[in-house]
Amino acid sequence: VDVDFRQMNAESIDLPDASVDVVFSSMFLHELSLKSIGRVFAEIRRVLRPGGLMLHMELPPNTQMGAFEGFYLDWDCYYNAEPFYKAFRDQDPRELCRKAGFRDDHYLQFVVPSVWNHGEAAVETAIAAEGHEVNKATTGRLSHGGIEWFGFGAWREAQS
């Protein structure tokens, strides 16, 4: 697999239209304002080839967490200089993708365990599983059983 890692302004990606197969970010979006996220998603959609994948590992949305778990995760917004943290977690990831022009039926969401706590086999099993529900006790937070990571994204529609 030919992989090209680049660091640049995600709101103004210096690549031609429809030129990449995958755009991936990890723990990035919650550092941005909602306005910036919209611009980033639009840029990602622009540079993705038809059938390309946008994928983000992020914090789980508040709508999929219980009240205590939401409070626990949102603590950083108030006491750890994370000003966009809660506003991001209050969003519906599917709607963020839809607003950027991704089709609703091309949205994907998943939860995978930490490879460091559970090993590669557990991650592969989680990826292959049906239904990726957020575990209120372990997704996005440290716990006795390790941590699970929330991910979401969308495929750009293939040209017909």
Residue spans of the language-model regions?
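A short acidic, Gly/Pro-enriched loop at the edge of an enzyme's catalytic core
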Residues: 11-23
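Conserved SAM-binding strand-loop segment of SAM-dependent methyltransferases
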Residues: 2-12
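A short glycine-rich, Lys/Arg-flanked "PGG" loop and its adjoining helix->strand segment in the class I
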Residues: 38-50
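Core SAM-dependent methyltransferase catalytic element
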Residues: 98-160
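Conserved Rossmann-like nucleotide-binding pocket used by diverse enzymes
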Residues: 6, 24, 55
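C-terminal alpha-helical "lid/dimerization" subdomain adjacent to the S-adenosyl-L-methionine
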Residues: 55-119
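A short SAM/SAH-binding and catalytic strip from SAM-dependent methyltransferases
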Residues: 21-35
